[in-house]
């Protein structure tokens, strides 16, 4: 479906005359991936729904009605993906070829084995969010030995491993029906702590389901029918501090925390302090925001909790501008300015186009150039970029579970794969991309030209989202040194070059329809 885009002109014209420097400023964090667990600014994350990626070991596939070998009849069942399958793709170079330096995988803990029927459809815990024991593995993904092997394989390729972790809840439960599912039972390395019904120890909240009307309502009531854990209970508090230490000891490099909006802020800050005092790793949380939504509590959490957040403000705006066409580049510029003002560490927020809870960015039958441009923006913007599995293969799918379909292909020749592979390494080679500030340099409804700057390191990116009209760009002033900037993606796409004068002024040039151009500089070394 993507081959027709391989010969399109001027999709990404990445212009580089690398000038004046080869060493990052002293304040820049080390770029080596697995040696720096606390800062992911130089990394590109690849999010994997483990069950939907590769079945590397058929022996651990669930038995009976929980498993669909075709992964097509019912996407709510297990499909067979596991850690061995991820290792296979690590070892064959699929990730390193794309420039990926971190893998975010599904929650690895033991989940319930029950098949739960909702409205006539069987549901399983393939996604990893229906936990029963946070100190054991999900056998459908592999054993502790398999997990250790995954960490080892990733680290041998200088790839970090981030685990999803969902301490907000266990599994579906009903207050009046202990036989529903597995009654939300929580185990401690095989020993039952308690279930939702008959909860005499107060391990869970029993306030009904949240209607999302207030923050407090969402914290102390169940998220849908998921048994909501009481983190103010000392046993639960100790349990999760010990549970995450087990995974830290296994060698993980990062944590994505599910549903942070639905847990007490004070407990999360204390939990993060426990993590940082034990083995600090980069941690980011999920706080969903809808289109054009802002929330002072979201901002406060990002600034005060000790963890970063998935940047839904970035994602929703990029989707509006590039995917849906419902906003202009002025809206994009406004979002970048407001988030830079709101988030103290805006470069540490995790940016993305889509994930397992959203419609995929690529729309069936839509022009793939929109996706490719949005990827280029995400990879060169502030924040830590995360790519959802299959994006590079133009996978489509609206809503759960269609947005979690089986990985469709592992082609390394798609335009999207090559865009990622060319732009991802820039986060290590140019500190402006990893650590820089962002300044708008030229704008209209369709064109956005922005500059990233860190010390004397500069990157200038120009994007024309109009797929049918070119624009003459005049009066553009930058911090780029003088020189001619040529297309480093010439092997993939046909780009143009630009000429910069001594004052940083760019000679008038034409930005092609659907085009993007980036100029990069570093100090002391010149490449012509």
From Swiss-Prot:
Note accompanying the cofactor annotation: Binds 1 Ca(2+) ion per subunit.
BP GO terms, sorted: carbohydrate metabolic process
SUPFAM superfamilies per the UniProt record, alphabetical: (Trans)glycosidases (SSF51445), Glycosyl hydrolase domain (SSF51011)
Entry keyword set: Calcium, Carbohydrate metabolism, Glycosidase, Hydrolase, Metal-binding, Signal
Annotated active site: 258 (nucleophile), 286 (proton donor)
SMART domains to which the protein is assigned, alphabetical: Aamy, Aamy_C
Chain segments annotated as coiled-coil in the UniProt record: none
GO molecular function terms attached to this record: alpha-amylase activity; calcium ion binding
Residue positions binding Ca(2+): 168, 228, 262
Family affiliation: Belongs to the glycosyl hydrolase 13 family.
Protein's recorded name: Alpha-amylase
Originating species: Niallia circulans
């Amino acid at each position: 479906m993507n081959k027709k885009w391989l010969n399109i002109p001027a999709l990404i014209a990445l212009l580089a005359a690398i000038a004046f420097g080869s060493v990052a400023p002293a304040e820049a964090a080390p770029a080596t991936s697995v040696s720096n667990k606390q800062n992911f600014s130089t990394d590109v994350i690849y999010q994997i729904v483990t069950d939907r990626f590769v079945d590397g070991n058929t022996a651990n596939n669930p038995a009976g009605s929980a498993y669909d070998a075709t992964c097509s009849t019912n996407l709510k069942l297990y499909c067979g993906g596991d850690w061995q399958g991820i290792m296979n793709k690590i070892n064959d170079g699929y990730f390193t070829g794309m420039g990926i330096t971190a893998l975010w995988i599904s929650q690895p803990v033991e989940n319930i084995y029950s098949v739960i029927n909702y409205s006539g459809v069987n549901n399983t815990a393939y996604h990893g969010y229906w936990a029963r024991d946070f100190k054991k593995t999900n056998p459908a993904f592999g054993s502790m030995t398999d997990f250790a092997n995954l960490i080892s394989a990733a680290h041998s390729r200088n790839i970090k491993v981030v685990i999803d972790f969902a301490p907000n809840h266990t599994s579906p439960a009903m207050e009046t029906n202990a036989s529903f599912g597995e009654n939300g039972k929580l185990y401690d390395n095989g020993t039952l702590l308690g279930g939702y019904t008959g909860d005499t120890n107060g391990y869970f909240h029993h306030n009904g389901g949240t209607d999302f009307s207030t923050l407090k309502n969402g914290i102390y009531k169940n998220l849908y029918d998921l048994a909501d854990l009481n983190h103010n209970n000392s046993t639960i508090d100790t349990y999760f501090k010990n549970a995450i230490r087990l995974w830290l000891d296994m060698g993980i490099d990062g944590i994505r925390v599910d549903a942070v909006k639905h847990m007490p802020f004070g407990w999360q800050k204390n939990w993060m302090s426990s993590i940082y005092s034990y083995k600090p790793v980069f941690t980011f949380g999920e706080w969903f925001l809808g289109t054009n939504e802002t929330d002072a509590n979201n901002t406060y959490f990002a600034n005060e909790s000790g963890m970063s957040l998935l940047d839904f403000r970035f994602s929703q705006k990029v989707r509006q501008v590039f995917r849906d066409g419902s906003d202009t580049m002025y809206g994009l510029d406004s979002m970048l300015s407001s988030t830079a003002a709101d988030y103290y560490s805006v470069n540490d927020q995790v940016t993305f186009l889509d994930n397992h809870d959203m419609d995929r960015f690529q729309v069936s039958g839509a022009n793939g150039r929109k996706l490719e441009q949005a990827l280029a923006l995400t990879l060169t913007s502030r924040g830590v970029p995360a790519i959802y599995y299959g994006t590079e293969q133009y996978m489509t799918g609206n809503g759960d579970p269609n947005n979690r379909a089986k990985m469709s292909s592992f082609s390394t020749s798609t335009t999207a794969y090559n865009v990622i592979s060319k732009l991802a390494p820039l986060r290590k080679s140019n500190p402006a991309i990893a650590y820089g500030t962002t300044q708008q340099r030229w704008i209209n409804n369709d064109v956005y030209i922005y500059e990233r700057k860190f010390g004397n390191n500069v990157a200038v990116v120009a994007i024309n989202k109009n797929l049918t009209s070119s624009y003459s760009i005049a009066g553009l002033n930058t911090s780029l040194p003088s020189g001619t900037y040529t297309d480093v993606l010439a092997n993939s796409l046909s780009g143009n070059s630009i000429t910069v004068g001594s004052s940083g002024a760019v000679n008038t040039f034409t930005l092609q329809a659907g085009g993007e151009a980036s100029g990069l500089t570093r100090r002391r070394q010149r490449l012509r």
